[in-house]
Amino acid sequence: MDEQERQRLIKEEEKNTKRLRFLVDLTTSVLYQDHTLTLEEARTMVRNTEKAILAMFPDKQQTFDIVLRPRFERILHERWGAGVSGLVH
């Protein structure tokens, strides 16, 4: 791999990382702040967020399950008293 290709891959990874942060922050904000959101809609939002993240980082399912799923689980439990157990992996 030449230096130009290496730099391109680094920039792509940085772009995906920024998108990941934005997506997680946006999802977290909506889950906390949209008082019209139902539990099922929230679960769907988490499921769609997971799909989007795994499309950017296909080999990171375990990381999602360890780092982000508990975060979303906590939010859903705080808001609705139920977690993401209705999610299909």
PLM feature segments, named:
Residues 1-89:
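Surface-exposed peri-terminal alpha-helical interaction modules
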